[in-house]
Regions:
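Long, charge-dense
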Residues: 1-45
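Short, acidic/turn-prone active-site loops that include or flank metal/cofactor-
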Residues: 31-33, 84-87, 102-105
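Active-site glycine-rich loop that binds ribose-phosphate moieties when present
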Residues: 34-54, 60-67
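Solvent-exposed alpha-helices and their adjacent loops that cap or buttress functional pockets
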Residues: 51-55, 71-74, 89-91
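Short, well-ordered beta-strand core segments
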Residues: 59-60, 78-79, 97
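Short, structured coil segments at secondary-structure junctions
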Residues: 22-23, 75-76, 92-93
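A short, gly/pro- and small-residue-rich
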Residues: 66-87
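C-terminal functional extensions of proteins
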Residues: 89-172
Length: 172
C-alpha cells in the first residue's frame, strides 16, 4: 500500500509503477483508493486504502511516524517497525522493532521468515507471546552504548561502520 506524507497523484503513479516493475501484482492506496482515514493521525499519512492497512492484522513499517504507529496499535494491529533509532516514537510504540537500516534488514528478515516457515503455528504463537519489545530496545541501546564507548577509545571512529553482524542480528 502506498502511503505518503507528501502526497501527489504524480508521486503515487510513479511509486505504483516502480512497485509493479518490482513484482507487485496489486498496489493499494493510489488516488481515490486511499479513501479511509486512520483516527488520531493528523498528517497526510492518515489516508489509507480500506482494503489494506485497515484490514491487515500485521503491518510492516519503515520510515514511519510515531502517530501512525500509535494509531495502528490502538486498532490492535501487530506493528513491526524498522527504525534506526531505538528511542524514536515509532520504535517505542511498535509491537516489534528491528533497529537497523531498512535496506540491510529486508534480506535478513526474508531469511528469518524462511527459517520460520516450518515452525508450527503453536510455536510461532508462543514465540510472539514471549517477545518483549522493551527488552529488545534495551538490548539495542546497550549495544549502541557499548559500541560508542569502544569507538570513543579507539581510532575506529574514522572508519565509521557497524560491525559485520549489524544491529539486526540482535533484534530479529
Amino acid at each position: 500500500e502506498i502511503n505518503l506524507f507528501h502526497r501527489s497523484a504524480s508521486r503515487e503513479r510513479k511509486i505504483a509503477a516502480h512497485m509493479r516493475r518490482a513484482g507487485a501484482t496489486t498496489v493499494l492506496g493510489v488516488g481515490k483508493d486511499a479513501s479511509a482515514s486512520l483516527l488520531e493521525t493528523l498528517s497526510n499519512r492518515r489516508r489509507v486504502d480500506p482494503r489494506g492497512l485497515l484490514k491487515a492484522d500485521t503491518v510492516l513499517l519503515a520510515l514511519e511516524d510515531g502517530d501512525r504507529t500509535r494509531a495502528l496499535r490502538k486498532m490492535d494491529k501487530l506493528v513491526i517497525a524498522v527504525d534506526l533509532n531505538p528511542l524514536s516514537r515509532t520504535a517505542q510504540e511498535a509491537s516489534i522493532t528491528i533497529v537497523d537500516n531498512v535496506i540491510r534488514v529486508m534480506p535478513l528478515l526474508c531469511e528469518e521468515i524462511k527459517k520460520l516457515r516450518s515452525t508450527t503455528r503453536e510455536d510461532l504463537v508462543e514465540l510472539l507471546r514471549s517477545y518483549d519489545n522493551r527488552t529488545n530496545l534495551s538490548k539495542c541501546l546497550d549495544f549502541i552504548s557499548s559500541r560508542l564507548k569502544k569507538l570513543a577509545k579507539t581510532d575506529e571512529v574514522s572508519e565509521g561502520s557497524l560491525p559485520e553482524e549489524g544491529l539486526a542480528r540482535i533484534s530479529i
